[in-house]
């Protein structure tokens, strides 16, 4: 299966979540520090995690039905594999080149494109997960247009 790798934009990533970036409000002043809550969750308590990604292929995707999850690249290059909540076979792959937040229930996994990649993750403390295993590992390949 060949899946084209994309760079996330507000438009092409909207159905999976959002890109964490400044807004009109946070850019509204050249001299004052601005703060804006971009997303939240009804559940209590969040955890922050540091993920070192070394795998170059994915054996499965998982979802967190009741939790959003942020992926914030720190070092190296990795790819984010995602699929809609109700269509886990409809995979898309994005370069994780900016911080993003996944909606609740979006199927996902990450694989390294560089030798290893480091990612900061934030998600609900009591997160629950569901996993779907692929028949064969999915190994993204960069191709020319």
Question: Where are the regions a protein language model picked out?
Answer:
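Non-catalytic, conserved peripheral segments adjacent to functional cores
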Residues: 1-94, 114-116, 122-136, 141-145
